[in-house]
Amino acid sequence: MKTIQVNQMCSPRTGNPVANQFKIYTKKGVYFQSYSTIIAFKPHDFKGKLKLDESYWDYSRTTLKYLYDFININHRHRSKKNILKLIQDKQIILTNLN
């Protein structure tokens, strides 16, 4: 039985797989990886909070674009300001994921 599964993320516009953006499924939860860097972690346990890497979560526009998809932020609410508000409200935790 596999304990880790890696899937390439798909473009929301075309539905085609995109290079260098991955979801990594583990027993503990799902990681979002952009290129070779872990950006975010969503635990399977609903009591656990979303964790973002404190150094890389907003590394580039592309990283943010796929981070929004990973955490299911709809197009109307996609802004760095909204994520910063969630961090300030302690709904998202910044930590070292790398």
Language-model features and meaning:
Residues M1-N98:
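Terminal leader/tail segments of proteins
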